[in-house]
Amino acid sequence: MGKSLIQQRRGKGSPTFKSPSHRFRGAVKYIPLNYTQEKTLRGVVEEIMHDPGRTAPVARVKFENGIEKLIIAPEGLLVGQEIYIGPDAPIAVGNTLPLAKIPEGTYVYNIEGIPGDGGKYVRAGGTYALVVSREPDKVIVQLPSGELKAFNPMCRATIGVVAGGGRLEKPLVKAGKAYYKYKARNKFWPTPRGVKMNAVNHPFGGKEHHPGKPTTTSRRAPPGRKVGHIAARRTGRRK
């Protein structure tokens, strides 16, 4: 009998594949909408921290009503800096306000998908979105992928560019650095190729060092066989 594939083991959910969330700083969400829908709150940045679970640093902010929140830090944020969240917040880096109040051509990040969800889009280090146009019923924003997406005007966003840009410009150089990179998030690494495995471990395994069978697989194949090009319309280089 063959052994389970990596994706079968991952689906079972053993500690090998679980995210080490106990090491992470915590959830990064905006202050609930009912606090800031009518008035603007002032907060002070108390600390900027590294978060192993993210590609950007996070900042701990204490607001004037006593609530403490973690936010994704933008480029240029300082400890002790005052930031504002609400409909009347000034247009400045680090401030959060509804998209309807943000002028066209402004860089924003951590955009809500639905008003009050805390922020879902553009949260990775070095990323930003661009407010393209505003209409009464929607705001058009250009995402980092280049896609133009319409948002509810009441969705909140933070002004600025996410800190941590240029992270990928420095090469890893050696496998030892990659080891620690993946270890921080408990990623299963390195990932062996199927053709390098034994026949008992993978459908493409065995001594021949090539699959030995077509690499296209049915969408309805059973879990132990569903490897390779799944339900592919075509394979290989375009001619």
Swiss-Prot record:
> Which InterPro entries does the record match to this protein?
NA-bd_OB-fold, Rib_uL2_dom2, Ribosomal_uL2, Ribosomal_uL2_arc_euk, Ribosomal_uL2_C, Ribosomal_uL2_dom3, Ribosomal_uL2_RNA-bd_dom, Translation_prot_SH3-like_sf
Q: Which UniProt keywords apply?
A: Ribonucleoprotein, Ribosomal protein, RNA-binding, rRNA-binding
Bias category Basic residues: which stretches? 222-239
- Determine if RNA-binding is one of this entry's keywords: yes
**SMART domains to which the protein is assigned, alphabetical:** Ribosomal_L2, Ribosomal_L2_C
Any one Gene Ontology BP term = cytoplasmic translation
Task: Select a single GO molecular function from the record's annotations and give it.
Answer: rRNA binding
Q: A Gene Ontology CC term for this entry?
A: cytosolic large ribosomal subunit
Keyword Acetylation among UniProt keywords: no
Per its UniProt entry, which superkingdom is the organism in?
Archaea
Subunit organization: Part of the 50S ribosomal subunit. Forms a bridge to the 30S subunit in the 70S ribosome.
Q: What is this protein called?
A: Large ribosomal subunit protein uL2
Native species of this protein?
A: Pyrococcus furiosus (strain ATCC 43587 / DSM 3638 / JCM 8422 / Vc1)
